[in-house]
Amino acid sequence: MLFRSLGAFFTLVSLPVMLAVAIGIKLTSPGPVLFKQNRYGLNGKQIPVWKFRTMRVMENSAVVTQATRNDPRITRFGAFLRKTSLDELPQFFNVLQGTMSIVGPRPHAVAHNEQYRLLVENYMIRHKVKPGITGLAQIHGFRGETDTIDKMEKRIQYDLEYIQSWSLLLDIKIVFLTFFRGFVGKNAF
């Protein structure tokens, strides 16, 4: 309940920024402002996760291709949004809906989830808690593209560590560190 209240607070505070981002997207590329992708949430239930659109509108495909550094699909304004993590702001609406938390393991696209559950031991344990906008893995530099199994295994290790050692103090620490490490970093693109 505390984090839902904080989600409401952050949503209200970020509304002017969200409006500016929405205008920026509309002025710089055709297509919708928001992008919705199904991901797995608590107990492996599929949930729609909202983000600001950072890529050119392409045909809808069942194949989900991860964005990569210098990906030609990413717009110039979209690159800025990704670098600063402003593309994640609509996920506060997911927090208000109760499908996400501010802190928790980041939700992965359904196609990626199906792939990694077969390759990474204990992968599915991460669905024992609500997914988050930020998490322990993100403040340790694991955000953006996961182009190797080794990177995904390390990311999952942080997710499992978070679940095993959860506390309100840990969540506060992660939120605090997200502002200094998570939003802008070498792995952000």
Identify the residue ranges that each predicted region occupies.
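A hydrophobic, helix-centered structural microdomain
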Residues: 1-59, 94, 168-189
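Gly/Ser/Thr-rich helix-start
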Residues: 8, 32, 42-45, 79, ...
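Aromatic-acidic/polar surface patches that form glycan- and anion
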Residues: 13, 70, 82, 165-168
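Short, hydrophobic secondary-structure boundary micro-motifs
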Residues: 21, 35-36, 103-105, 111, ...
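A generic fold-level signal
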Residues: 29-32, 69-72, 95, 131, ...
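Short, glycine-rich, amphipathic interfacial segments at transmembrane boundaries or analogous
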Residues: 35-73, 134-157
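A short, structured surface patch at a secondary-structure boundary
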Residues: 67-130, 174-182
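C-terminal terminal-structure detector
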Residues: 122-189
